[in-house]
A protein has these predicted regions:
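Preference for extracellular/luminal or secreted protein segments
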Residues: 1-38, 254, 273-363
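Active-site-adjacent structural elements in enzyme catalytic domains
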Residues: 54-65, 107-123
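Second-shell residues forming the walls of enzyme active-site clefts
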Residues: 21, 27, 49-68, 74-76, ...
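Active-site-proximal loop/short-helix segments
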Residues: 88-93, 127-147, 178-195, 227
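A charged helix-plus-loop insertion that forms the helical arch/lid used to bind
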Residues: 92-105, 149-151
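Catalytic domains of carbohydrate-active enzymes, especially glycoside hydrolases
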Residues: 33-46, 115-128
């Protein structure tokens, strides 16, 4: 029998809906308060949190130790794609970007690289990876995604991403495909302060850009990261993360997606400037998001308190909150998340395995 949302207080329910960043390389008393008082859903490890293998292990172990008194385990997430999208310590050999592996056409090699990535993450106690990127390449070449995309062909992206997702799952890692509904045909994609948008109709997007996302849904994907992308023909005035028409009507109802919807970092300048962090969180929940990423640790407590207040005032439906938090609890249960301490890490062995895979890619 899994964990029940009925056993959580309102504060704890709200806490479960957020994946947050931390400042620096050590979990301090402020982090402990977030864990023990607000029962935060999990943490996102970024490159500014990583110095070395030893330090990263200490950090993750300390986060889990802080959560030892809570019944619900932590998500510990990372965006580890390979290539330049690499967060792991420099002591770990870097795997190539996914595009170059996919170009080999060798699905077995792709699965091997993905399995190894999952194995490395699991060795650190990380249990969620914001990957793979399902956006199509081509239109984003030389831009912010470039070699992070698998292919320009939606059929290839669908097929290869399925291999990646399966490999992560086999290693006990929660895969989080991104960035629904896709950047490929958007404008302003190179700007950090203007929301990327596309004026394509949904019908045209469904023929190309949305194909990999729909395939992942049909294959039963448990999570999906939504990007700050404006579908102008569907909702002119809001990014996908804050659009009821995109999240609820399109993703949940039309595509019958039953998994956990995660909003990309609400601290991103393109939304924070326009809506503010609290306004962004409210809008994301109203749109249908189940979880939200907030990488700026300093802003987390204010958002948690504001969302709790909005529920008490009736501005957010408590029954709907319960349904979403239960999905989060079920996700953690399905992947058997535990706050276990990692006591051993074999750098040499992992690097040898990475070198073997790199040699196969070079052939």
């Amino acid at each position: 029998m899994g964990k029940s949302v009925g056993n959580l207080s309102l504060v704890e329910k709200v806490g479960q809906m957020f994946l947050v960043g931390i400042d620096g390389t050590v979990a301090d008393e402020a982090v402990m308060e977030l864990v023990q008082t607000y029962k935060i859903g999990g943490f996102v490890i970024s490159d500014n949190n990583v110095e070395s293998v030893e330090q990263l292990l200490r950090l993750i172990n300390s986060l889990k130790a802080m959560n030892a008194g809570n019944e619900v385990p932590l998500i510990v997430a990372m965006s580890q794609e390979g290539g330049r999208a690499n967060v792991l310590p420099s002591q770990i050999r870097k795997l190539p970007a996914i595009k170059y592996i996919a170009e080999s056409g060798d699905k077995n090699l792709l699965a091997e690289v993905s399995s190894l990535t999952g194995k490395i993450l699991r060795s650190f106690g990380i249990n969620m990876n914001f990957a793979p990127v399902l956006d199509l390449g081509g239109a984003v070449e030389g831009r912010m995604l470039s070699d992070r995309c698998i292919s320009t062909n939606p059929t290839i992206v669908s097929s290869y991403s399925s291999q990646i997702i399966s490999a992560y799952k086999e290693e006990g890692i929660i895969p989080v495909p991104k960035y629904f509904p896709g950047h490929a045909t958007t404008k302003n994609k190179g700007s950090s302060i203007v929301i990327p948008y596309t004026s394509k109709s949904i019908q045209k997007l469904e023929q190309v850009d949305l194909v990999p996302f729909k395939a992942a849904i049909e294959n039963g994907i448990e999570t999906m990261l939504v990007g700050h992308i404006n579908l102008a023909r569907l909702n002119l005035f809001a990014p996908a993360t804050m659009s009821y028409k995109v999240i609820t009507k399109l993703l949940k109802e039309k595509y019958e997606y039953k998994g956990v919807v995660i909003a990309d970092d609400l601290c991103s300048a393109c939304v924070d400037i326009q809506y503010g962090i609290k306004g962004s969180a409210r809008r994301a929940i109203l749109a249908g998001c189940d979880m939200m990423v907030i990488k700026d640790f300093r802003k987390v407590r204010g958002v948690l308190e504001d969302i709790t207040k909005q529920i008490k005032k009736g501005n957010l439906d408590p029954k709907e909150i319960d349904l979403r938090v239960q999905k989060i609890l079920d996700l953690k249960e399905k992947f058997n998340l535990k706050d276990e301490e990692i006591t051993e890490f074999e750098i040499m062995r992992l690097n040898e395995e990475i070198e073997e895979v790199i040699e196969k890619i070079r052939r």
